[in-house]
Curated annotation (Swiss-Prot):
GO terms for molecular function: rRNA binding; structural constituent of ribosome. SUPFAM superfamilies: Ribosomal protein S19. InterPro entries: Ribosomal_uS19, Ribosomal_uS19_bac-type, Ribosomal_uS19_SF. GO terms for biological process: ribosomal small subunit assembly; translation. Protein S19 forms a complex with S13 that binds strongly to the 16S ribosomal RNA. This is Small ribosomal subunit protein uS19.
Length: 93
């Protein structure tokens, strides 16, 4: 179920405050654990380091990302491929 329109997008307060401070000053990377925060238009052009459970993934925010969640751009799982079939390997030799 989608979030109610009257509530507006969810953004952690500390993240919004850091973004406003960065707008005026330097182009430093903003480190965050808040994967649940929605990307708002004020974040365009900023770089966030979003935590994926193990390390921080740098995410540069563009116009196309507005309305999505921070966590969508920081994958938490690594896919190494499906396990090879041992029977088919034996037949090839």
């Amino acid at each position: 179920m989608a979030r109610s329109i009257k509530k507006g997008p969810f953004v952690d307060g500390h993240l919004e405050a850091k973004a406003q401070a960065e707008q005026a000053g330097s182009k430093k990377v903003i480190k965050t654990w808040s994967r649940r925060s929605t990307i708002i238009p004020e974040f365009i052009g900023l770089t966030f380091a979003v935590h994926n459970g193990k390390k921080f993934i740098p995410v540069f925010v563009t116009e196309n990302m507005v309305g999505h969640k921070m966590g969508e751009f920081s994958p938490t799982r690594t896919f190494y491929g499906h396990a090879a079939d041992k029977k088919s390997k034996l037949k090839k030799k």
